[in-house]
Amino acid sequence: LIKDVRGFTRDSDQEILVGSWTSYEVDMKEHLSERIPTVLSFVLIVTMVLVWFQVKSVVVPIKAVLMNILSVTASFGLIVVVFQEGLLSDALNFTPQPLDVMVPPLLFGIAFGLSMDYEVLMLSRIHESWLETEDNTRAVAEGLQASGRLITGAAAIMIAVFSGFIFADVLIIKSIGFALAVAVFVDATIVRAIVVPSCLLYTSDAADEGLGVD
């Protein structure tokens, strides 16, 4: 309707503006749709370049980005099921409705940053172990052991903080808190503890060179 009204008044001699919260959301959605590909490309490329400077490997930065995206997409899926489909609407005391247009960009930025923080911490420990042993399997095991407690503790703190927002009355705050808690939980318990070590061992021939460069 808003697009129809704007199209109908476009040829008018007078400047006619269409207001209201709905028109704001329409404009914001179009603006985000135009900018998101550029922002995503910038974030992913810069992330891979910085990780490459750390480990001097082509495979490891790509793996790092993919693992982070895995955590973020898991939270995206659950937030849709819970808040749009209403899976936990009674338990969390809210009425199911479409997600606010600002939720996905905010969620991606925060969750991706936290995931990369844990990734860099783990890669640093693995890299240090490789320099001492030059054994990829042992380096992954020792790196996971050295960083595991720190990552788990940091994740537990963040989950506790984000979970507090779930009890908010404002739906956008509730949904962001839930999604971030899920993203951190998935990242710390599944991605960092299982998927990342498995990928490093599976791609050991390609990653081995990078993990051992000064």
Go through each PLM region and give its residues.
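Hydrophobic, glycine/alanine-rich multi-pass transmembrane helices and their short helix-loop junctions
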Residues: 50, 148-201
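Conserved small/polar residues in nucleotide/adenosyl-binding loops
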Residues: 202-208
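Structured non-transmembrane domains adjacent to transmembrane bundles in polytopic membrane proteins
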Residues: 1-89
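Membrane-water interface of transmembrane alpha-helices in multipass transporters/channels
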Residues: 57-66, 86-107, 167-181
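Helix-loop junctions and hydrophobic alpha-helical segments within the transmembrane domains
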Residues: 130-152
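Alpha-helical transmembrane segments of multi-pass inner-membrane proteins
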Residues: 38, 42, 63, 100, ...
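Short helical (or helix-break) motifs at transmembrane helix termini and adjacent helical loops
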Residues: 109-129, 151
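Alpha-helical transmembrane segments of integral membrane proteins
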Residues: 40-51, 67, 71, 104-111, ...
